Amino acid sequence: MPHSNISRAPRQHLTERVLQAKTAKNLTWAGLAEGTGLSVVYVTAALLGQHPLPQAVAEVVAERLGLDRDAVAELQTIPLRGNVEDVSSDPTIYRFHEMVQVYGTTLKALVHEQFGDGIISAINFKLDIKKVDDPEGGERAVITLDGKFLPYKPF
């Protein structure tokens, strides 16, 4: 039976344990996700407290991290999602906020023009990030947000 958190505290505490173990064991997110059948993005988000993991995956990553049975159970619990009460001051996270501040209304206008009145699901959703060479030198981040369009329905 699925269980659900009504507080962020249990997952925040577990996330700290995950990060400590990951660092101590010199593991990567890709290494933790390897062989689970889930994407590195999903497993990373789950280990950072944003998704539950299936039991088999929770057991695999907990073993890799050296976590106990209580951690395996908590990794399967549906979390209280979202961990930012206000705008984060972390520069990487803030840049995403800034992108939405600058391009949010443009994205909204283009989504509505191309799809109609509705939203892009963050539930039926995939996220990918790739590092590519910049022709002008350096590297670029290519981030793909792939969500199902859900139209509003009159009733």
UniProtKB/Swiss-Prot annotation:
GO terms assigned for molecular function: cyanate hydratase activity; DNA binding
Matching CDD domains: Cyanase_C
InterPro entries reported for this sequence: Cyanase, Cyanate_lyase_C, Cyanate_lyase_C_sf, CYNS_N, Lambda_DNA-bd_dom_sf
Tagged with keyword Lyase: yes
Gene Ontology biological process terms from the UniProt entry: cyanate metabolic process
SMART domains cross-referenced by the UniProt entry: Cyanate_lyase
Highest taxon in the source lineage: Bacteria
Classification via Gene3D superfamilies: Cyanate lyase, C-terminal domain, lambda repressor-like DNA-binding domains
Catalytic activity as recorded in UniProt: cyanate + hydrogencarbonate + 3 H(+) = NH4(+) + 2 CO2
EC number of this enzyme: 4.2.1.104
Residues at the active site: R95, E98, S121
Signal peptide: none
Function: Catalyzes the reaction of cyanate with bicarbonate to produce ammonia and carbon dioxide.
PANTHER family: CYANATE HYDRATASE
Family label: Belongs to the cyanase family.
Name used for this protein in its record: Cyanate hydratase
The species this protein was found in: Pseudomonas syringae pv. syringae (strain B728a)
